[in-house]
A protein has these predicted regions:
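Gram-positive cell-envelope targeting signals
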Residues: 1-53, 57-68, 75
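A residue-level marker of the well-folded mature domains of exported/periplasmic proteins
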Residues: 40-473
């Protein structure tokens, strides 16, 4: 009996210690589930529609030494800010790496110590997100940043329960309608950079076509040049990006078609390499990507080394290094632009945009330095196009430049439901529906990332063929 009593006393003491020890833990409550060309590549011929009398021929690609020249002047005291970062990947893939580098750069600039940033990597499910949020709050983080929409529910729930902390979801789509003053969404206007990269691609294709450098396998049965594109999921983020890229190409090279392969994963190096290899073997002249890893670039570069000259448009700066021969340029986001603004505003306790989106004009997106095999006069052409994009003379999704099912789109086609549910939510009772069509002096365009920052251009425009990786053509 004494042994039993002693055991009960010990068990009781342990229970008390556990209760006391756990009294201050932050637990975010999860909702109950109810989802050939020559090696030099510098032929003298250029497309006939290129202006020959441009005064300014400066390189339009990004030069990091010119970015954020005023950063050094922004050294606000950021004492008291502790940042928790939840990443869908890590430094081995382009997307998360770009956020890591941008957060570190912005933090150093305004004086946030490295010890005041805590990282959670490869958080790619809702359940993992809830756990990561709870742990970061327990550790005293008062600004939580997540870089994927799959993490959105966990941060929104935490924002409701923790009004004194701030929560950011990159690519989230609920800040505009959430009613939460401490919840933020952000996304760059990367579609603008993808359009510019499409112009670069179109210039090269026009050069190759004019010189007779494309094999018969590089054309489809309608005599259109075949270009491949490797995307993640069939969502607005992917559709907006490859549609912009296609329209950029088509603005220079009319007889072009885009073949999109979905890997149906955010990052799978084997799947992405398989998609690239399949496109190369099928005869695609050029391949672009949205997918996150460098395996596409590496696969194309290997083909190049073997004499199979397939050209490449990348996504992120790491791609340029991995495909130094094949790459023409890459579309990139400079997330430090956002994080500098966010950290400064919060440290100074100033109001900040809850649904942030910036692009070429603000330096938030760009294309990288042009590759050594671009067509002649590409820099001049891109500079001219970029100027039009930034001064409102040209819009990526001008509705006169594309059709859907052979028809021009109208308001009904361009309606955006800002309360549309994702795969884990019930539909809202009162939907907030707005038209994305906007008029300007020259016509009408679909205004992407204006009604909210996250992409919503999800129209399947003519000239683009979509397939899952497992499907045969």
């Amino acid at each position: 009996m004494k042994k039993i009593v002693s055991a009960l006393l010990v068990a009781g003491l342990l229970a008390i210690l556990l209760i006391v020890g756990g009294a201050h833990r932050h637990t975010v409550v999860k909702p109950v589930a109810e989802p050939e060309q020559t090696a030099d590549g510098q032929d003298e011929d250029v497309p006939d529609d290129i202006d020959e009398n441009l005064d300014d021929t400066d390189d339009v690609s990004r030069d990091d030494t010119d970015q954020n020249e005023n950063d050094a002047d922004q050294t606000e005291d950021a004492d008291g800010m502790k940042i928790g970062v939840i990443l869908i990947g890590d430094e081995t893939e382009n997307y998360s790496k770009s956020h890591i580098e941008a957060i570190v750069k912005a933090a150093e600039t305004i004086g946030i110590a490295a010890d005041d940033i805590e990282w959670k990597e490869r958080i790619d499910s809702s359940d993992e997100s809830y756990d990561a949020v709870s742990e970061l709050l327990d550790d005293g983080c008062n600004l939580l940043i997540a870089n994927a929409q799959v993490q959105q529910d966990a941060l929104m729930d935490a924002a409701e329960e923790n009004p004194d902390a701030s929560f950011v979801v990159i690519g989230g789509d609920k800040a505009a309608v959430s009613g939460l003053t401490n919840y933020y969404n952000a996304y760059t206007d990367i579609y603008e950079a993808r359009y510019l990269s499409g112009v670069v691609a179109g210039m090269k294709l026009a050069q190759l076509d004019k010189k007779g450098k494309i094999s018969k396998y590089g054309y489809n049965k309608y005599n259109r040049v075949r270009v491949g594109y490797i995307a993640t999921y069939p969502n607005a983020e992917a559709i907006s990006g490859y549609s912009a890229f296609y329209l950029g190409m088509k603005s220079v090279m009319k007889n072009v078609t885009l073949e999109v392969y979905y890997t149906n994963t955010w990052m799978d190096m084997d799947a992405e390499a398989t998609a690239a290899d399949k496109m190369i073997r099928s005869g695609c002249v050029l391949i672009a990507q949205q997918a996150d890893s460098t395996s596409v670039a590496e696969t194309i570069e290997k083909a190049w080394k073997k004499g199979r000259h397939v050209y490449y448009i990348g996504s992120g700066e790491a791609a340029d290094v991995a495909a130094e021969d094949a790459v023409l340029t890459s579309a990139v986001s400079d997330w430090s632009v956002y994080y500098m603004q966010l950290f400064t505003a919060l440290s100074e306790e100033k109001d900040f945009a809850q649904d942030w989106s910036q692009g070429l004009s603000e330096g938030a997106v760009s294309i990288t330095k042009l590759g050594k095999h671009v067509a002649p006069k590409t820099a001049e052409k891109v500079k001219k196009v970029q100027k039009k994009l930034t001064n409102g003379k040209l819009y990526v999704f001008d509705i006169t430049k594309f059709t859907v099912g052979g028809m021009r789109i109208g308001d009904a086609d361009a309606s955006v439901d800002l309360t549309a549910p994702d795969s884990t939510e019930e539909p809202a009772e009162d939907d907030i529906v707005k038209s994305a069509l906007t008029s300007y002096d020259g016509g009408t365009y679909f205004a992407e990332s204006v009604l909210r920052s996250a992409p919503y251009f999800d129209l399947h425009i003519d000239g683009i063929k979509e397939m899952n990786l497992t499907e045969e053509e």
